[in-house]
Amino acid sequence: MFKKFDEKENVSNCIQLKTSVIKGIKNQLLDQFPNIDDWLNQIMPKKDPVKIVRCHEHIEILTVNGELLFFRQREGPFYPTLRLLHKYPFILPHQQVDKGAIKFVLSGANIMCPGLTSPGAKLYPAESDTVVAIMAEGKQHALCVGVMKMSADDIEKVNMGIGIENVHYLNDGLWHMKTYK
């Protein structure tokens, strides 16, 4: 999604949100990420301005004080940015890939089933279409945010094809964006 993303070329406009819209977004975030409940007021303080940065390809990035927090495509689900995920790693369920998959994931490739079932990888129970953080064997922080394309049970049974779609990874265009004022 952000492989060829460039802030100067892809950002079309930025709008400040009304309080009623912010409440709706917070409720949507709570529904989507129940683990965020205790931390949402710390992530999105009440008095701080919340803005939506609109980009090409119908991508919207939610910012507070210029810090990029969540993004979504069209009116789809929100995904946390990796910077937010590194501060609050418990927001998303984790899946772990083996060392051999790291360079491919960091170049934007989707996570294949064998990379999740081999020694060194850890596959935790999760349903299809669940937003997950991708951890790497021997690494502390998440290297990618992805969406399960199959349930964990199906990944173990089939062990072929794409298991998790890579949505946002370290060093992609969104990672390099840092802040937006």
From Swiss-Prot:
Domain of life: Eukaryota
GO CC, alphabetical: cytoplasm
InterPro entries (alphabetical): MCT-1/Tma20, Pre-PUA, PUA, PUA-like_sf, Uncharacterised_CHP00451
Keyword rRNA-binding annotated: no
Transmembrane segments: none
SMART domains xrefs: PUA
SUPFAM superfamilies for this protein: PUA domain-like (SSF88697)
Domain PUA, chain residue ranges per copy: 92-171
Record-linked PROSITE patterns: PUA (PS50890)
Keywords, comma-separated and alphabetical: Cell cycle, Cytoplasm, Growth regulation, Transcription, Transcription regulation
Keyword set includes Transcription regulation: yes
Protein localization: Cytoplasm
GO molecular function: RNA binding
Biological-process GO terms, alphabetical: formation of translation preinitiation complex
Function, as annotated: Plays a role as translation enhancer and involved in cell cycle regulation.
Entry's family note: Belongs to the MCTS1 family.
Domain notes per entry: The PUA RNA-binding domain is critical for cap binding, but not sufficient for translation enhancer function.
Name of protein: Malignant T-cell-amplified sequence 1
Originating species: Danio rerio (Zebrafish)
Annotated gene: mcts1
